[in-house]
Regions:
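Short, contiguous alpha-helical
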Residues: 31-75, 104, 116-174
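A broad, low-specificity signal for short, low-complexity segments enriched in glycine/proline
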Residues: 4-8, 65, 104-106
Length: 174
């Protein structure tokens, strides 16, 4: 499918962008909350993984059913109930990548008219397949901004914890 090829490529690229941002973080860094009042990086990764499964389900249902109902999922309830800090970041990113690869294959196999198929979202109303794919792309990119900010805050915190004593010796502050 030529029409949606660029959209599918952008959709596929998201998982690798996330992987690059989190792959070198320690468990402690993933679970830290360097930005007051915000989720940890681990919570963001788990939220993205859970959301990815929902986005894929919605896309599949729009392709397979006539005007299916697409339910809203409350991210705060998912975060509270689904053990985000007990999960594994590498596994969660792999789930996102796997789901996106599967969906990309499905999307590439569709006719051009499939992009206009619709579902009825419980809060957002009518949504086309194209809008659902774009939402999945935008959602991940939106959260990458927060992951970058958390990384920056962690780096700044680490820099502030390094001090030099009077003899020129570097010491680490806790």
């Amino acid at each position: 499918m030529v029409e949606g090829s660029e959209l599918i490529d952008a959709y596929l690229a998201g998982a690798e962008l996330l992987r690059e941002l989190v792959q070198d973080l320690s468990s402690e860094q993933l679970r830290a909350r360097p930005v007051p009042g915000a989720w940890s990086t681990m919570e963001v990764v788990c939220h993205l993984s859970d959301s990815e499964a929902l986005f894929a389900d919605r896309m599949k249902r729009v392709l397979a059913e006539d005007r299916p109902a697409l339910q809203f999922a409350d991210p705060a309830r998912y975060a509270a109930a689904l053990a985000y800090h007990e999960r594994d970041a590498e596994e969660e990113v792999a789930i996102i990548a796997s789901v996106r690869r599967q969906m990309a294959r499905i999307l590439r196999s569709q006719s051009a008219g499939a992009w206009d198929r619709v579902g009825m979202h419980s809060k957002e109303g009518e949504r086309t397949l194209k809008q659902l794919v774009r939402k999945a792309i935008d959602h991940l990119e939106h959260h990458l901004t927060f992951v970058r900010a958390k990384r920056q805050a962690l780096e700044e915190s680490a820099e502030q914890s390094v001090a030099t004593d009077g003899a020129g010796t570097t010491t680490f502050q806790s």
